[in-house]
Amino acid sequence: MVAILKRLGFSKLIVRWTAQFLRERKVRLKFNNITAEERVQLVGVPQGSPLSPVLSIIYTSGLLHQMKNWNNSSLGMYVDDGALFACAEEWADVDKLIRARYTVCEEWLRRSGLAIEPEKTELIYFQKQGVAFAMPAPTRLRLPMPSHSTYYEVIPSDCVRYLGFFIQRRLKWKTHVTIMCNRAKASAMALKLLGNTIRGLSMANWRLVLNAVCLPVLGYSCQLWYVPGKSKGLIKQTQMVQNLMVRMVAGAFRTAPCEPLTHITRMLPMEQYIEKLTHTSTLRLYRLPRMSQLLRRLGPDWYSPCPGDNALAVPDHLPSRGKSKQHPTVLEALARRVPSHGPKVDWTVIAPWEIPIWAAQTSHWGVTNPAARVEWVQSLVDIGLHSGVEVIFTAAKVTGRDLEGTRELIPVGGASVVSQRGSNDPSTWKWTMGSEATQFDVNAFALAKAVEVLASTYAAGVMPPPVIYIFSTDNSALQAIRNPRSIKAHAHCIRFHKALTTFFLTHRDVRIILAWSPKNDELRSDLLACTLAAEASQEFPPEGMDSVQSAAYQKGRAKARAFEQWERQYRHNRMQEEFRTTWLGTVIAPPRFCYQHAISDPPSIHHHPLWKEATSLTKKVAGQRRKPKYTRCTTSTALQLAVDHAFTGSYARRFRPADPPETHLCVCGPVLRDPAHLLTKCPLFHQQRVDAVIITNHRTLSLRQLFQSHPERLLAFLQAPGIARPPPNTSQQEWVEEEADTGIG
């Protein structure tokens, strides 16, 4: 290892440090807070060390150089996993090529003190789909084993696992998606230990846990297999698992319709979720280093060659026989989702070991009591009129403007800075940042410009005051701007860093305080800053409008598009349902009930009123932890009634036809025990309705009002015992089993 570092040109200091690090290694294993005895590590570095992957890459780098003259074959390495790839016209040539490349790798590893494990070696032959009279792939491959002067055979597999991907020989992704769905379903079923429909986690916590544990498994590697409009079968598989998750969150029966429950719980359907995930994951291209092989394969739009660089590894996409154009690769298809001129992150601007010279001279004052901070800022401004303290107010405004004449409002950001020092008139600056930016982007831009103003104002020998206050209404921007390696506002952080570095090179004794302060229209300077920012957001800069296309803006747009697609699907389904009901005479009872009473608006980024109230917490009390306002049993019953899949006679009549007809009736009389009767008419619960303010002035709230306008009254009513419970004439165990089939009861 030391010899390799010397040959690669590492400094003597790093070589000596690595040599000492690898010498006389001792290891202590820790598992479940139990630490084992210390033992000597004679060879290698144990897994888990942050330095292990770095040393592994350096040690095996020579193996990758072995393929620089290879043709029609390649070698890929990921720590201790390697993949040999070869292509040819005939299977015999493929076998010959693979065997030759394997021999080269085996010899290099053996000379380096490493070895290939034959029992872990896998083989797969890829074959095009739909090729007539295609020659079948070989049934085995013989590979040399020089250490034993023999060979071993590898049987080709129809599907192999590599780095978590299950790759099929015809590049079909059904096997991979099926395995991921089974894993997500198993995780969801294991989470049943956390509660059921009576007790346990609240609905909000159920959604949080399932989204954190199961959704990442369902969406793993979706960027490889998802094609908009062409992956319906795979999407359907993942949607079935999500339906289970939705029922677990809502505490619903296994027969409950999932579409309205998904609407109420605001869990994006899998098609929209995967579309959003695919788009947002593409934004990682902006964070890749300039020399990344991924960017090189995307061509000149993403990669700018420097003198001495090799030719771009971008193939000429010649059309296949019988086709007018070549399909893009997965990487190219992903890159087309985002603009190539977006905000890239340059990791080489600041060295990892560099400590800004201004770090010790700047402070951050975060969010506190708004009234107290406003009063303090007012007193600071009053004192500054006589003491010479400089106070700087930053403001930012995002205004929707029709820039292209298409009636589509595009957000345009404007920023301003107002500086007040002593009794002098305030100095003002304003800028138009550009279009397609978020409020956070403009706030960070305003802070960076404020520091640039400081650096330019006090550059020509002008002495600044000993303390300078910079105020902003966005605490997240204040926190991000102080981190020169921030990803959220990278460009603004670099400008902030360079300006402060320039400022403190000549003024080392000045202290700068970045403080949060709410908007205060009674303060002249603050009001002036807000006015100037609003004016800047309406102007056109002389050099033209810059398209910012920040990552935060693109994430927000991806989320908005996902909900727009969901809304279109919702309206399409309602039109189909109306057509079936009106012209075909088909009545789908559960959706008709919920869309008639509980759901009247299409899905949006806002929560359904019933969900918002059901997940609310108790009031904040000093020294006490906030708890869910309603019990799990109450919230589950509310959602069961919303879709008419509850312990009611209307549900039993549809799904329990073997029950006697009299069990469908209410105890109060010969009336069907449906949600409308239980919630608004049953005389047995009249007093509970009065207590929950469902009946006021001899007027009873309608079901629509209960589910959408006054869900707090519905939930207060359902907290009374005995409501929407199994009838006394029916075995409760049978009803519980119906619920238990969902895996949540």
Predicted regions, residues:
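Conserved pre-motif C helix in the palm subdomain of viral-like polymerases
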Residues: M1, Q41-W70, C105, N211
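Helix/loop segments that flank and initiate small ligand/metal-binding modules
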Residues: Q20, S379-H386, V548-L672, H698
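Short, conserved micro-motifs composed of acidic
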Residues: I34, A100, A115-D158
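RNase H-like nuclease fold core
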Residues: A36-E37, A351, I355-A460, R482
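Active-site palm subdomain of RNA-directed nucleic acid polymerases
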Residues: E37, P53-E89, A460
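RNase H catalytic domain
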Residues: G82-A88, K230-G233, V398-R401, L447-T531, ...
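Basic, alpha-helical interaction scaffolds
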Residues: S149-W225
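Family-specific functional microsites
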Residues: T502-R508, S604, E613, T618-G745
